[in-house]
Each structure stands twice: as structure tokens, then as C-alpha cells.
Amino acid sequence: MGLAGPRKRTKISHDPNNTAWSRSTSGYGHKIMSAQGWTPGSFLGASNAAHADHFTAGSAGHIRVILKDDNLGLGAKLRAEDEPTGLDAFQGLLGRLNGKSDEELEKELKKRHDRQLANFVEKRWKTMQFVSGGLLVHEKIQALADVKSAGGEEVQTPQISHDELKSEKRPKKARKKEKRRARGDDTGLDLAEQSPKRKRKDRKENKEKKKSSDDSSYANQGTPSEDALVDKIQKKRKKRKQKDPEPSNTEVHDDSLPPDTRSVSQEEQESRYSAKNESIRKIREHRPMGRQFTRGRHIQQKKLALMDSKSISEIFMVKC
């Protein structure tokens, strides 16, 4: 028994580089891809596609896998082990020996500095890298050419007056309104523009105008029977207006009445007003139905029991 650790017997496989699957032509993937027009060494996708110019030699190659040789997590990179230090100064020295100017050396140094900063940010905070999936539409930018005639004379553009430009800018509705006004059809306005209140007012006014025109036509006629009918209609309207006056919240005070009678009349009015309000409240009471009704009764009983001291003592079994 020595101090040596346990021996690990490793067996080298027949395919250490793992390239047998890419060379085999008997697999299902190779067969179906070759049936669809793929050949070994060519990249995937149509060769006449709009984004075919962006393909490189790497597009035809396989996906490379780096073997993990450290205890870091997946996707981690060795930071400072493989990076040489002092290489920037050495490259600058070689550039001066080759006869490069100071401006060129400063530009190269700035590029390297920016690249180092980008690498540091990517390692520290992880940036997103976008891969282009191809061009959707193959656009061609055409240069604008001056429109000239065959003889070299410039084509004269028709001059448009200021009024015509204004008329073009105006909306169609405004033009239609102006045309109607010119014709004299002011009554034919768009009903869609009018609000519903305006529509109701217009209807009422039209009805009143019709009634007044009918009354005037009846009055203009000379027969005594028709005049009597018109008088009756007008009297009926006056009576209706007197019977149904508008409700007013303001109190009416009669200066002619004495103070005693005035106070009595005010008390009678207030009593009538309160009675009316009570009747309205009774009518407007919400009466729940079904489950809500039973729940409401139980809640009322609980409230009454809590308000009564005897019932509380009975609930908690306390002797008074």
C-alpha cells in the first residue's frame, strides 16, 4: 500500500475527435438532407436568397464544442491566464521601428483600449449579441435624377395659386358646407355633427312652429265655428299650464296675510312636505330578496341583541 492515488484507466475510443458522425452517409439526417438538395460542404438555405451574400465559410462548418478543462461554470472563459500582459507597448515599439507616425499609433492604441473595455463589460455585466437572420426585402436605393427634356430644357412645373392650395388643404366637409351655402341649402346640415340635445331642441321648435302655423291658419279663416274651436284649444292649453306649474323649492310669502295666519300656513306646508318625503322614502326602500333578505334579518337581530343589556348578559351567561 503506497501513498499513490487510485489509478484511472482511460480507454481511447476509435473516434477521439468525434468526426465519424459527420463523415457517415448512412444516417437519417444525411439521407433526408441530401434528398432535399443538400450536398456535403454546402451551407443550409437557398443559394439565391437575398441574404446569401452574408454567408461565410463558417456557415458550412459544424458547430464547434470546447472541452471543459477547469472548475468554472458552463460558458465561463479563462480571464487572465491566457492573456499576455505588456503586448500593447511591444506592438507600439514595433510600429515606431517600422516608421509609423505618432497619430497612427495613437489611433491603434485607442482601438485596443476600446476593445479591452468592451471585453471587460461583456464579462462583467453580460451583453446581448444579435445575429442577423437575413434581409426580409431586398431594397435597392435609386439616386434621384433631374427630370429634363430630351433637348436639355427643364420641364416647367405648373404654378398653383395660393387659393387653390388653401382649398386643397381644407377638408371635404368644409367644401360641402360652402357649396350648400352657395346653393341656399343651409337647412341640410349634417345631422351627425349635431349633438343629441341640439336635435331634440330642433324637433321641439319644428313641432311648435307647426302648431302655431295650424292655429294661425285656423284663425285666418273667417267662419265663426272655426274661431270658436281655436279659442277652446287656447283656453285648454292655458288651463293645463296653470294646473301643472313647475315645482319651486323657494318658499312663497304673502305680505297681505297677518303674521299668525302666515305662520300657520307655513307649518301646514312643512307638514305636507315632510309627509310627502316620508312616503317617497317608504316607496324607495330597497327590499332584498332570497338569501340577502334572510341575512339582513339575522344581522338586524344581532344588532338589537347587542343594544339590549339583558340579552348580552344572557348570551355571556352573566347574572345581573
UniProtKB/Swiss-Prot annotation:
The protein's location, in the record's own words, is:
Nucleus, Nucleolus
Q: Spell out the InterPro entries in the cross-references.
A: G_patch_dom, PINX1
Which PROSITE patterns does this UniProt record tie to the protein?
G_PATCH (PS50174)
Q: Name one GO biological process term.
A: rRNA processing
GO (cellular component) term, any one: nucleolus
Pfam families documented for this protein: G-patch
Q: Residue spans with biased composition (Basic residues)?
A: 1-11, 169-182
Per UniProt, the ranges with Basic and acidic residues bias are 203-214, 243-256, 269-288
Q: Which domain of life is it from?
A: Eukaryota
Q: What family is it from?
A: Belongs to the PINX1 family.
Question: Annotated Gene Ontology MF terms?
Answer: nucleic acid binding
Role: Involved in rRNA-processing at A0, A1 and A2 sites and negatively regulates telomerase.
Domain G-patch, first and last residues per copy: 25-79
Sequence ranges of Polar residues compositional bias:
15-24
Segment Disordered: which positions? 1-24, 152-298
Q: Which UniProt keywords apply?
A: Nucleus, Ribosome biogenesis, rRNA processing
User: What protein am I looking at?
Assistant: Protein PXR1
